[in-house]
């Protein structure tokens, strides 16, 4: 499947790096009672995440500040924060992470271990390829559990396909329509970096 990054994104973030991995024919199920591998992976990611957190105030982390600055460069929904900030906040609060499904657990553990936003979509649910760019405004978006449309704002940075927004505010919230589930067979995973000097891989 074709993945496109529009020039409007590069105009805002000329030093960014968007890494994409395509997976085909996968089994996205696991019996956690018999195989606790993904719970252990999440625990390891959360433990390593402390390397990127100020014990007194997680918001002072340079990784959190980096993404807050990035979000200030485009139109966002009030209160929207990057996915990595949400994960680091949960770690700082001492909250436990429980498995969702193997692919989601994998990208969440990588995200915490390296302080990089990671995400993924069900390739078979995308229509006409995946793009990252600036919203025209009004692209339909239904997050998990929502019954009402929460369309993208004009100028917002979003992932989108021919049917609408796939992930809003770059990496803030994804659509239920294309999210990874245990039924997913083909998937696209994405890792985002805005400031290459902060990559710890």
Task: Briefly describe each language-model feature range.
Residues 96-120:
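Conserved phosphate/anionic-ligand binding catalytic regions in large, soluble enzymes, centered on
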Residues 33-87, 92:
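Glycine/proline-rich, flexible active-site/cofactor-binding loop segments
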Residues 199-201:
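Conserved small/polar residues in nucleotide/adenosyl-binding loops
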Residues 135-167:
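A structural-propensity feature for long, helix-poor, extended segments
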Residues 7-11, 98-101, 122, 144-149, ...:
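A generic local secondary-structure boundary/capping motif
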Residues 111-138, 156:
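Class I SAM-dependent methyltransferase SAM-binding "motif I" and its flanking Rossmann-like core
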